[in-house]
């Protein structure tokens, strides 16, 4: 029996976490995209939301259908409170950053017994530099991002000393605390849109995504024959389901250096793609883009191939969706409960004809 803390599930298959991590960003991406899915599916609640700034209601689900777009959002808006949440020890982060700053300013920490000693030694060194300009001149780093990071640290320290009247130890700890908060927020610089590999998932239909079976599901046709399509699909990755919590301590140790592809992989492997095994039946894939690479949001996506109507979709909404699909020649199908299992299956009838007969029957009854 496999150790649940050492394994993970990716696209329905079990792997060792250590093997997946060893793939690196390139290896994982190649493995994920070597055999492209022909379709991916996105569940929509088909509900209205009031937008106070516009003083009107929006049905973003129907707008996605009309415009052929998908919306990328922050992970904090997802239904899993652990999603992309980073639990990073403040004490370890503080110790790592202190060690780095002591190294940058040639502070001897060989006799230091702990964090307090390092703070004191660094305080003495910065005090000897005099004012802020003197401390800035003491920086001898070539990496522009690293140099800028240290400059920001110094400006925060000296700002606290002058305007807040803090002591050296307080100012140093406060500056590193701000670095810690900035680092924790790094995952929010990415936006995510979620997809599944099947339109028949009970978990998705019964959740907020499918609005208790009252929403609909859009099937998108994956087309990698164009450069635009390949670029889009290559930014969609399978979720890594595991019971092992994410930890970005390794990445935080050199968070002031120019980021590398390995740094990006650690962010994806331990954060953006990591979810609990409890959610594996969502069969999730994620389109992940950094803020700076999103030209439009909602973003144009692959061609809509088919619409799946929820088993409990209200009559009025079902007519609306069906009529739209018929007008724009988009195939559609209603989902019903299988008589012999707990699976959702496609209805053999045409929703349009069923709804038409239902409407005619209702009109006849009213005319009696």
Regions found by a protein language model. Name each.
Residues 2-368:
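Partner-binding and oligomerization surfaces adjacent to conserved cores of proteins
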